[in-house]
Design a protein with these regions (language model features):
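Carbohydrate transferase catalytic cores enriched for Leloir-type hexosyltransferases
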Residues: 1-383
């Protein structure tokens, strides 16, 4: 008898790379569980452009590559795949027209409740659509995966009458294949390509307003006006776009492109994943100023690289942080500026070189331990 299957449909997340990385990370945890792998075969449905995210799993999963641009053909393909090929569960199922047909097989996932905690960052029609989608998931008796206690608290606050079976499952960032590909030659090439010859701190988020780059940019402006950290660059990656809040991007650009800030900021745009991790690996330290996260992938990346992180003081970060994280008020540029100076001074001390370089092998070993522990929560759903 053929094995039952768990379907991870990545076609719905094509416009959100973080959602695809999340699926990859959950699959990694599933593969650490003998209880899951002996009962189920994991199937990933993905488009050709993003298939390489999942090829690292080799023959441990079935990769179904499908273009998906023709919605009618995609619907027929999905129905055929689920009905005729033994799919028992659909992980992170979306309750769209097709997904609703398979609601009984759905494992739902809500990344966070940002539209409830920061509604001012959304357009009214997007708020309404998001609330309808989330409410439908909470009203069904299916398992609902949340990534943090903070998200669970938000669920209880905003949807107190929910009927879903809540499963709290953290995730690690499975980046070992990318890290193993980083060689001294690649590090040199990346430094040359992006002009990273000086010491730098790194901010790796896309420029959504809730990522709160503005506090970092204003902190850098304060430093430069005082002539501090003259030997440091500040490196940003991610698309400088937020369709919800274009005026926010204009505000950031106005500061970033003016002196004395402009000469110290490097806006690299969207970079390939291995290059991005190479940049993180060689940063003096990381800054993560976000106002909202479900369970932050940036922080999980930094943990695997064993990097020091200046981290916004929000509930989920208090839950997620490790001993190499220092919290700061995400609304106080002056406090962050002072912390940047203190951390840079410490990073420049020879006795702290190893601490700030990070121990990648230690981080990878810890990633495996945590993934195995998180797999227990997935077993509660599938086994």
């Amino acid at each position: 008898m053929s094995m039952k299957k768990i379907l991870f449909n990545g076609l719905g997340n094509r416009g959100w790379i973080g959602g695809l990385y999340y699926l990859k990370n959950i699959i990694f945890s599933c593969l650490q569980s003998e209880e899951i792998t002996k009962k189920y075969r994991i199937v990933v449905l993905i488009d050709p452009e993003h298939a390489d995210i999942f090829t690292c799993f080799g023959n441990r999963i079935d990769l179904r590559i499908y273009d998906g641009t023709n919605k009618v053909k995609l619907a027929l393909y999905e129905m055929n795949l689920i009905w005729l090929h033994g799919v028992k569960y659909c992980y992170a199922l979306e309750l769209n027209r097709i997904g609703s047909l398979f609601a009984s097989r759905g494992i739902f996932w809500i990344p966070d409740f940002q539209h409830k905690t920061l509604p001012e960052f959304f357009k009214p029609e997007e708020l309404a659509r998001k609330d309808v989608t989330d409410r439908r998931m909470t009203e069904l008796s299916n398992p609902l995966v949340l990534s943090s206690e903070d998200a669970k608290n938000d669920l209880e606050r905003f949807y107190p009458e929910h009927q879903c079976k809540v499963q709290l499952i953290h995730f690690v960032s499975y980046i070992e294949p990318e890290l193993r590909a980083i060689t001294p030659k690649l590090e040199h090439e990346v430094a040359e390509k992006f002009g990273l010859q000086r010491k730098y701190t790194y901010l790796p988020n896309q420029f959504w307003k809730h990522k709160n780059h503005v506090v970092a940019v204003k902190a850098i402006e304060l430093l430069k006006k005082q002539g501090l950290l003259a030997d440091y660059d500040f490196v940003f990656t991610g698309n400088l776009k937020d369709y919800r809040n274009p005026e926010y991007i204009d505000e950031l650009k106005k500061i970033m492109e003016a002196q004395p800030v402009a000469g110290s900021i490097k806006l690299l745009g969207f970079v390939e994943r291995t290059e991005q991790l190479c940049i993180m690996k060689n940063a003096a330290f990381i800054v993560q100023p976000s106002l909202c996260e479900g369970w932050g992938t940036v922080l999980e990346d930094a943990k695997v690289l064993d990097k020091a992180v200046l981290l916004s003081d929000i509930p989920v970060h208090r839950e997620q942080k490790n001993e190499k994280c220092v919290l700061f008020d995400p609304h106080d540029p002056k406090a962050l500026a002072q912390l940047l100076v203190e951390t840079a001074e410490k990073a420049d001390m020879p006795e702290h070189t190893a601490y700030f370089a990070g121990d990648m092998e230690k981080g990878i070993a810890n990633m495996y331990r945590e993934a195995e522990a998180y797999a227990r929560g997935l077993e509660n759903i599938f086994v």
